């Protein structure tokens, strides 16, 4: 105890040197700890999200992109699925079938065109307001409502894909009807609308505003006055879709088969399809994380080299310190301090430095993963 106290007093007198040593050791420990914990947190979040999503059907292409698109609304789907495919799956009775149309954003948040079944499927609860019921209605995720500073009764315009395309589709004004309770998943980031509203955003459906039509002129400038589309009780009945609605696009279809037999039937349905594919997200995510783990193994080897170099440098510093303190140690010996006590003092100094470095590294790694956990839960694509 006396050795620890004396060592502590010594280090307090040399705070800068002690602080540099603590910071160096802590940094060498922090990097592998933070990397391991962050990867584990990401693996847990991605695995949990995938485990609650039995199957995803979408355009044939990158399996990773399709799964991330269906789970996180981030990666872009390489193609589309006709709405008729959704209808066929639902009528086949394989289980619960949910449409997804995710191509646009509103205020930087992904606009998720789906059905009310999605809320039941993900076990999403309303925190405020009501669910979407009409064209143009939207429900915000917990993070989306905070980022957009909106709540029930507010309005939100969709983002233009190309700000310089004045002849392109107009943004659609969405009416916020409710806010979802926080789940800590990608659903917190979404702006949820009915799939028909998503088609209107895509320009596949439109309505007619009679009041504007009566006052309109044929001059080009009259068209440019219009800045966005708005669905109101007065013009809602005029909105319609041209052509066959069964041919309208979806970006993915979520399928929750009732049992293993239905799962096999859905997989077999698309096994030989050249345009569509059915994937099991848990399998794809495991493969994806396997690649991440291999990268982590490479980083672990690098961290081992860094730790070794840090250890050698620390040993050199200790050796030089002993040489610089040789006269000090000799004076202590002449005053009656034995060589064993001197060794105990220097050991106590190293013990304090390493303990402080370990505590600092653990705290920093824990804080980093804690800060990034919500981001990791929604990050993909």
What are these language model-derived features?
Residues 1-33, 338-339, 347-350:
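N-terminal Sec/SRP start-transfer signal
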Residues 1-13, 43, 47, 54, ...:
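Feature of multi-pass inner-membrane transport and sensor proteins
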Residues 14, 313-352:
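Interfacial "coupling" helices/loops that link adjacent transmembrane helices in transporter permeases
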Residues 20-31, 296-316, 353-361:
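Alpha-helical transmembrane segments of integral membrane proteins
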Residues 32-110, 117-120, 134, 242, ...:
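Hydrophobic, regular-secondary-structure patches
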Residues 170-171, 179-296:
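Mechanotransmission and gating elements of multispan inner-membrane complexes involved in transport
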Residues 356-381:
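Short helix-loop junctions at transmembrane helix boundaries
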């Amino acid at each position: 105890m006396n050795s620890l106290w004396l060592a502590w007093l010594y280090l307090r007198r040399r705070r800068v040197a002690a602080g540099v040593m603590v910071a160096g050791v802590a940094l060498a420990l922090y990097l592998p700890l933070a990397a391991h914990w962050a990867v584990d947190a990401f693996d847990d979040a991605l695995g949990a999200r995938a485990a609650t999503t039995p199957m995803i059907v979408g355009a044939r292409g990158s399996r990773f992109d399709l799964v991330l698109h269906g789970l996180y609304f981030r990666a872009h789907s390489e193609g589309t699925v006709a709405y008729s495919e959704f209808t066929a799956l639902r009528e086949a009775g394989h289980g619960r079938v949910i449409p997804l149309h995710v191509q646009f954003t509103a205020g930087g948040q992904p606009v998720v065109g789906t059905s009310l079944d999605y809320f039941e499927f993900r076990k999403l609860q309303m925190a405020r307001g009501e669910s979407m019921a009409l064209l143009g209605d939207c429900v915000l995720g917990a993070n989306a409502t905070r980022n957009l500073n909106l709540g029930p009764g507010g309005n939100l315009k969709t983002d233009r894909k190309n700000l310089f395309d004045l002849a392109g589709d107009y943004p659609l004004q969405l009416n916020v009807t409710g806010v979802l309770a926080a789940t800590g998943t990608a659903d917190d980031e979404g702006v949820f609308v009915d799939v028909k509203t998503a088609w209107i955003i895509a320009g596949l459906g439109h309505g007619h505003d009679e009041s504007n039509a009566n006052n309109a002129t044929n001059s080009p400038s009259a068209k440019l006055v219009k800045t966005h589309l708005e669905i109101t009780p007065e013009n809602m009945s005029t909105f319609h879709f041209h052509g066959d609605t069964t041919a309208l696009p979806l970006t993915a279809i979520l399928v929750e088969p009732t049992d293993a037999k239905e799962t096999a039937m859905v997989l077999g349905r698309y096994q030989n399809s050249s345009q569509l594919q059915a994937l099991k997200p848990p399998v794809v995510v495991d493969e994806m994380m396997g690649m991440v783990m291999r990268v982590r193994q490479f980083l672990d080897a690098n961290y081992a080299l860094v730790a070794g170099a840090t250890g050698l440098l620390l040993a050199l510093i200790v050796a030089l310190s002993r040489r610089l303190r040789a006269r000090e140690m000799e004076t202590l010996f002449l005053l009656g301090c034995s060589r064993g006590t001197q060794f105990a003092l220097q050991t106590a100094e190293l013990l304090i430095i390493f303990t402080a470095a370990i505590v600092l590294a653990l705290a920093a790694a824990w804080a980093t993963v804690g800060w990034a956990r919500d981001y990791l839960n929604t990050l993909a694509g």
